[in-house]
Regions:
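Rhodanese-like catalytic fold shared by cysteine-dependent sulfurtransferases
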Residues: 1-35, 40-84, 93-144
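Short, surface-exposed ligand- or partner-binding patches at beta-edge/loop junctions that are enriched
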Residues: 88
């Protein structure tokens, strides 16, 4: 009897339909602006590892709810289905599954940073503490 699909199998299948960005390419796009960057990791993970500067935290478990225009808890920043969205997480797996879900929901321009935050760091870019200090004070950017 075959067991269900593994996490890796699901990520691989989702990745066939998802655009992957090398960290250098993602950095260029982010520097230009006009991009929504979302870290889909859990808040405790972001506190532990940090996140890419400018990232919003919307967890994998909340993303589809926040992106659904018919949900009460929808996020106004996710209403434009044509906007450029870049997703990340610790290693890229959860972000890939999340990107696949957003594409199924009708978002047209969704991509994932290859290797997630680890790939970002390996490319020589820094992560910022979460929550990011604002004027020397910690302020949560979580969208809960």
């Amino acid at each position: 009897m075959r067991k269900g699909k593994s996490f890796r199998e699901r990520v691989h299948e989702a990745g066939v339909h998802v655009a992957m960005l090398a960290p250098d390419d993602a950095k260029k796009l982010l520097d230009r602006g006009g991009v929504t960057l979302i870290d889909v990791g859990e808040e405790w993970q972001l506190r532990e590892r940090g996140t890419i500067p400018g990232a919003r935290n919307i967890t994998r478990g909340e993303l589809e709810i926040r992106a659904d225009t018919e949900q009460e808890r929808r996020d106004p920043a996710l209403q434009d289905r044509r906007q450029k969205i870049i997703l990340t997480c610790g290693g890229g797996g959860k972000a890939t599954l999340s990107a696949s879900a957003l594409l199924e929901m009708g978002f047209a321009d969704v991509s994932v940073i290859q290797g997630g935050c680890r790939g970002w760091q390996q490319a020589g870019y820094a992560l910022e503490p979460y929550p990011a200090p604002i004027n020397g004070n910690a302020s949560s950017r979580s969208n809960k």
